[in-house]
């Protein structure tokens, strides 16, 4: 049987990435050009800057991927690309590159939901036993997705306001940390204690929904009130502040994930998205999820990368190209959700 090679593009935010996946499981390369240093001084991603960097890096990444994988264009089976959700201009760079490459090399084009990519990154680590539940947490999303069978996605819960990663970045700015601040907060949290008892929103409801805006506001108000009293709590108690914030976030994520698994019994729990790199969350999951198979991707697959897009595209390819193939009129879908698939 002829080998399947998928060339995938990911440019939804601030990482330019191109990957090649063999037979749905062997990641031959996963080239990632990060833009963190360009956005750091602004305290967050600047869409126009992100798009310009994608334009500069995309061709370099394609060439690097083909060279590292030792694959030529005529060996490829299909081209895959993130169509959304994400930043419109950033998405368009990847889509135009993918369409051009597919057209020039007479290859089918497979559009992929970015969040399905985060979910299917787990398939590059271990075999997913269905049905499965996925906790997807990042700077822009916090949602729980039920996967009854391969390629079937049903969002069963999401945040009502801020995403978990967004809360981390906003709290990080108050703490005086540089963007992105999630890793530093995680490191500080491991040195402190939960002494401030920040609110855990919706913990006692039976709704599979998150809310982090109240926690963020409580953190900001505490810092402000302490400063008014002459207590520079950021300077004097940073580690305990970080620990208190992180424990509150993880408590909510764990509670709602367990609730979702009660409502939708599963064999596997998957974690994905940038916040899945958080050691506090990974430790709690490993300690408390014992009855179901737990798949936590390695750090290299937690952030945005084209390898995960290739993995999701392979699942789509198995459905039959007549059902999933896009035309050259494919456009960006910045607000794409699972229900649109």
UniProtKB/Swiss-Prot annotation:
Source organism per UniProt: Lactococcus lactis subsp. cremoris (strain MG1363)
Function as written in the Swiss-Prot or TrEMBL entry: Required for the formation of a threonylcarbamoyl group on adenosine at position 37 (t(6)A37) in tRNAs that read codons beginning with adenine. Is involved in the transfer of the threonylcarbamoyl moiety of threonylcarbamoyl-AMP (TC-AMP) to the N6 group of A37, together with TsaE and TsaB. TsaD likely plays a direct catalytic role in this reaction.
CDD domains: ASKHA_NBD_TsaD_bac
This protein's encoding gene: tsaD
EC class (word): transferase
PANTHER family with a match to the protein in the record: TRNA N6-ADENOSINE THREONYLCARBAMOYLTRANSFERASE (PTHR11735), TRNA N6-ADENOSINE THREONYLCARBAMOYLTRANSFERASE, MITOCHONDRIAL (PTHR11735:SF6)
The family this protein is said to belong to: Belongs to the KAE1 / TsaD family.
Protein name (database record): tRNA N6-adenosine threonylcarbamoyltransferase
Localization per record: Cytoplasm
Enzyme Commission number: 2.3.1.234
Top-level taxon: Bacteria
GO terms assigned for molecular function: iron ion binding; N(6)-L-threonylcarbamoyladenine synthase activity
Main location: cytoplasm
Catalytic activity: L-threonylcarbamoyladenylate + adenosine(37) in tRNA = N(6)-L-threonylcarbamoyladenosine(37) in tRNA + AMP + H(+)
UniProt xrefs under HAMAP family: TsaD
